[in-house]
């Protein structure tokens, strides 16, 4: 389908939805809500299409006016200005017309795990977790810790949280993968640089309508919460492990003192993992991408390197380096990487459509 046909389809659908909402005949509140949402999504696309077509028409008129000696200079100036602007307007519309990822508007669940590198990897995992917490705060998103398995000396073996806000998953989904750190640990007396790794997994938060869990498919185990070093930190069996029998996926949670709250959190995390598994199964390309990004936490598989002695952060997927590691770790400069990754993804998908 060529671009002009796509434009016409969008304009036709926009008029159709607007007419349906205006009449409102025989529509229940759910239908009205669905159509209103569709109209709000179509509005900016229609505006962009109209701006592109208007600029193109103005350019044709300017070209015709260049034949008039009295208008030649002014017409030439307008013609070349529009000619320069037109590709950007066209690209803007093309990006808007790219197929949407159904999960982009969802909230996200983040899991950070220490990989290779022992205690240094656990310390780095904790720093990454805090980086995303600060980044969420800068965007006005809500960051709610689900579970933390800490080492007792500042590191985390594993930590998870729910991030709630507008287009959270769309912004964060490219953070999934192995993050490598190179620096001199505080305990290193010889000043040698060590390499460690942590994995980040970003999953869309799944609702019950996305993944339905049958009680018969679940096994619940309760036990006492364990603190750092393995000592019990609770006198009741408040920690919960839930296993999805058909897939073997298991999730444990011990963050809260309430067994009921830990169970709810574990189910939420399990549902997200199952939803992500289902999404990957439906899309072979996405499954391959996730496998190469998330990996096993081994230092040989990496999407990004944080080199503290050089003060740089390098994203290997797009060959982008920022010499502002402190600003990235504080969340302030993370948007520069996120924006570049989103743009690279859009460029790839546009190239596939051509």
UniProtKB/Swiss-Prot annotation:
GO cellular component: cytoplasm
Keywords: Cytoplasm, Methylation, Protein biosynthesis
Subcellular location: Cytoplasm
Entry annotated with the keyword Nucleotide-binding: no
Region Disordered, residue ranges: 283-308
Mod. after translation: Methylated by PrmC. Methylation increases the termination efficiency of RF1.
Modified positions (N5-methylglutamine) in chain numbering: 231
Pfam families in UniProt: PCRF, RF-1
PROSITE patterns given in the database record: RF_PROK_I
MF GO annotations: translation release factor activity, codon specific
Role played: Peptide chain release factor 1 directs the termination of translation in response to the peptide chain termination codons UAG and UAA.
NCBIfam families registered for this protein in UniProt: prfA, PRK00591.1
Family to which this protein belongs: Belongs to the prokaryotic/mitochondrial release factor family.
The protein, known as: Peptide chain release factor 1
Organism the protein comes from: Paramagnetospirillum magneticum (strain ATCC 700264 / AMB-1)
Lineage, highest ranks first: Bacteria, Pseudomonadati, Pseudomonadota, Alphaproteobacteria, Rhodospirillales
Gene that produces this protein: prfA
């Amino acid at each position: 389908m060529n671009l002009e046909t796509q434009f016409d389809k969008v304009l036709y659908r926009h008029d159709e939805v607007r007419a349906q909402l205006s009449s409102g005949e025989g529509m229940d509140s759910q239908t009205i809500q669905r159509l209103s949402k569709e109209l709000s999504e179509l509005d900016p696309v229609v505006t962009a299409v109209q701006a592109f077509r208007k600029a193109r028409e103005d350019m044709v008129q300017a070209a015709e006016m260049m034949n008039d000696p009295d208008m030649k200079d002014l017409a030439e100036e307008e013609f070349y200005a529009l000619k320069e602007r037109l590709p950007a307007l066209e690209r803007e519309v093309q990006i808007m017309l790219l197929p949407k990822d159904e999960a982009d508007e969802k909230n996200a669940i983040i899991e950070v795990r220490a990989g290779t590198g022992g205690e240094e990897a656990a310390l780095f995992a904790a720093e990454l977790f805090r980086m995303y917490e600060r980044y969420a705060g800068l965007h006005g998103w809500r960051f709610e810790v689900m579970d933390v398995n800490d080492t007792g000396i500042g590191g985390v073996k594993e930590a998870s949280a729910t991030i709630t806000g507008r287009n959270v998953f769309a912004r964060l989904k490219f953070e999934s993968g192995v993050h490598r750190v190179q620096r001199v640990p505080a305990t290193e007396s010889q000043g040698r640089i060590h390499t460690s790794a942590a994995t980040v997994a970003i999953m869309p938060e799944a609702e019950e309508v996305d993944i339905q869990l049958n009680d018969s498919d679940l096994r619940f185990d309760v036990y006492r919460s364990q603190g750092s070093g393995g000592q019990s930190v609770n006198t009741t069996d408040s920690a919960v492990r839930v296993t999805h029998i058909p897939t073997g996926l298991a999730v444990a949670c011990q963050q809260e003192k309430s067994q009921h709250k830990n169970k709810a959190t574990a189910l939420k995390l399990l549902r997200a993992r199952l939803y992500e598994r289902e999404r990957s199964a439906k899309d072979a390309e996405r499954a391959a991408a996730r496998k190469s990004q998330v990996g096993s936490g081994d230092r040989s598989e990496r999407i990004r390197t944080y080199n503290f002695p050089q003060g740089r952060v390098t994203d290997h997927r797009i060959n982008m380096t920022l010499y502002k590691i402190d600003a990235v770790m504080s969340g302030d400069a993370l948007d520069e990487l996120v924006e570049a990754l989103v743009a690279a993804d859009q460029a790839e998908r546009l190239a596939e459509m051509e």
